[in-house]
Amino acid sequence: MNKDSTWPIELGTSGVLAPGRWLRLRSILWATFLSACAMAFFLSTQYLGAWLHLPPRSSYFIVLGIPLLAFIGYGVLISAAEGRKPVEVLPHTGMIAEISVGALLGFFMLCAVTALLWTLGLYHVQPNHWQHIFDSFVFNSYLSGMMEELMFRAILLRILGRAFGLRWGLVLSAGLFGIAHLSHGSWLAAVEITINAGLTMGLVYMATGRLWMSIGLHTAWISPKIPCWASTITTVCSKACRSPANPTYLPGGKFGPDASVLATFIGALAVAAIVY
């Protein structure tokens, strides 16, 4: 077991990640291969139904099932190539509790960000209608929470941490997480997401050594934003709309409150709470 002296995270020290010559190169190639596999699983959630000419309702089974298959596939590859138990993705007795704690953390973080923006007059809240909540959860929150945590935390953070040290693994994986969200907003939004989500979720994974709490945080961070506040998509219960008179970098633009410059304050508090 190779666990950092401070963080209970299994980095891997055998097989393809064994000490010795070309460790960094081997680590980068291994991370690239696993990331490509994870991306293949993700793309299959988007296109498998059309490729196989399946009925439209099959998309629910595809999106719910393929992330589970991705986790199983990851576990098989880790066992074979690294010669260890993939503890970061294995179910355990405290799994539900970890998911719940992560979900509460994500929910309250987004509540705090939205409340701050509302207090400063950058958002206004109005009633909305319940609709499409299950679809929003399955096709956005659940899918993103499972697949992005697998790729950016279990694969990139862990393996880059093995190659360059855990701090660099955290920073690099968080930066790549922000870059991956560039298509959703501006470069400034990507920087905010790097801090507010990338660092926070990475630290949660490092603090537990397992993905479940970070998956709960990730899922809850997305879930209420879409179905409850509808900061990017109008769907459910109450609607938080940014005031158009304010600069887009303050309320977060089209990506929503988690891309706000002011959300960095909440993200920094969360990071400090986890670290200290």
Name what the model sees in each region.
Residues 1-86, 226-276:
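N-terminal, membrane-interfacial amphipathic/helix-forming hydrophobic leader that caps
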Residues 190-249:
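Functionally important transmembrane alpha-helices
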Residues 61, 65-73, 134-139, 147, ...:
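Membrane-embedded alpha-helical segments of multi-pass membrane proteins
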Residues 80-87, 110-126:
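Transmembrane alpha-helix boundary signature
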Residues 20, 90-94, 125-132, 162-164, ...:
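Helix-boundary and loop/linker segments of multi-pass membrane transporters
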Residues 167-168, 209-212, 258:
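Residues that define the loop-to-transmembrane-helix transition and helix capping
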Residues 43-52, 117-123, 182:
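Juxtamembrane "helix-exit" motif on the non-cytosolic side of transmembrane helices
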Residues 126-185, 196, 200:
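Function-critical hydrophobic alpha-helical transmembrane segments in multi-pass membrane proteins
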